[in-house]
């Protein structure tokens, strides 16, 4: 049974791609049809790719690896931060600073500075300083926390990156490739799936879609770290407790009919 059902993907709007004039031909293998100028993603392909990504991330974490969740576009920020925290991993949700991976030694000095500022507040140092200086230090800490807070506890290179929209996060993907770090991520119809080790075709502009796919990857981390007494318990909340297969839930004919009858608008930017 798949880690996420096709029905859940449909309900979250994962199947809505970009406008047909904004597409990457390399995504053609993941496209089901076109509807009102919008590409419709083949969710049967999405199911397979998310299963592959889930197993891949789970196995990496089970071997002691760590995941860096990356998503700085508005639609992805909350899901990236929430799900990374839920599974105890690292994240970048505000801004990718050039060199976060390839110049980590320098980035690490800024992280150490952030830790130092927190220590100064906790040990009472702030109480001994003039208010103006404390205000300056607090502003410095807020800026560092915004950009580096999600990787404060990252003491080594991540074993894998999970990205939302590799076109947006091209610098992160490029740095990972330089260092030989595998990348898994959500690719919409305007992206190049060949940039990733495992590409999950899906809507990267709809908050619900991003949340569903990101939470599934977080579940893979949780399974690897904690194990599961009941395999159904750690799947996404939207996963139905059923013994029906995805094909029985939503067949290709059902999907086509859904697309033809759907009046839902795409979350296209």
From Swiss-Prot:
Q: Where is the composition biased (Acidic residues)?
A: 230-269
Q: Which domain of life is it from?
A: Bacteria
Cite a single GO BP annotation: translation
GO cellular-component term (any): cytosolic small ribosomal subunit
* Pfam families listed in its UniProt record: Ribosomal_S2 (PF00318)
Q: Name one GO molecular function term.
A: structural constituent of ribosome
Keywords annotated in UniProt:
Ribonucleoprotein, Ribosomal protein
The UniProt record lists the keyword Ligase: no
Q: Which InterPro entries match?
A: Ribosomal_uS2, Ribosomal_uS2_bac/mit/plastid, Ribosomal_uS2_CS, Ribosomal_uS2_flav_dom_sf
Q: Where is this region: Disordered?
A: 224-269
Q: Say yes or no: keyword Thylakoid present.
A: no
Q: Which family does it belong to?
A: Belongs to the universal ribosomal protein uS2 family.
Name this polypeptide is given: Small ribosomal subunit protein uS2
The primary gene name is rpsB
């Amino acid at each position: 049974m798949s880690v996420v059902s096709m029905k859940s993907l449909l309900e979250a709007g994962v199947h809505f791609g970009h406008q047909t004039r904004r597409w990457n031909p390399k995504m053609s293998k993941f496209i089901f049809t076109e509807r009102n100028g919008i590409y419709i993603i083949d969710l049967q392909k999405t199911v397979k790719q998310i299963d592959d990504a889930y197993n891949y991330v789970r196995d990496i974490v089970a071997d002691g690896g760590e995941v860096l969740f990356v998503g700085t576009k508005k639609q992805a920020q909350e899901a990236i931060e929430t799900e990374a925290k839920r599974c105890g991993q690292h994240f970048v949700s505000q801004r990718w600073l050039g060199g976060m991976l390839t110049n980590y030694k320098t980035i690490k000095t800024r992280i150490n500075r952030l830790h130092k500022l927190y220590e100064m507040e906790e040990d009472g140092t702030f109480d001994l300083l003039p208010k103006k200086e404390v205000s300056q230090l607090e502003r410095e800490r807020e800026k560092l926390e915004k950009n580096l807070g999600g990787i404060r506890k990252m003491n080594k290179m991540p074993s894998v990156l999970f990205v939302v929209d590799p076109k947006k996060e091209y610098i992160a993907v490029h740095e990972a490739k330089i260092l030989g770090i595998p990348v898994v991520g959500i690719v919409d119809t305007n992206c190049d799936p060949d940039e990733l080790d495992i590409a999950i075709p899906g809507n990267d502009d709809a908050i619900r879609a991003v949340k569903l796919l990101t939470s599934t990857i977080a579940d893979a981390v949780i399974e690897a770290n904690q194990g599961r007494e009941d395999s159904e318990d750690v799947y996404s909340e939207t996963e139905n407790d059923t013994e029906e297969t995805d094909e029985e839930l939503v067949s290709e004919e059902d999907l086509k009919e859904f697309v033809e009858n759907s009046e839902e608008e795409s979350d296209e930017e």
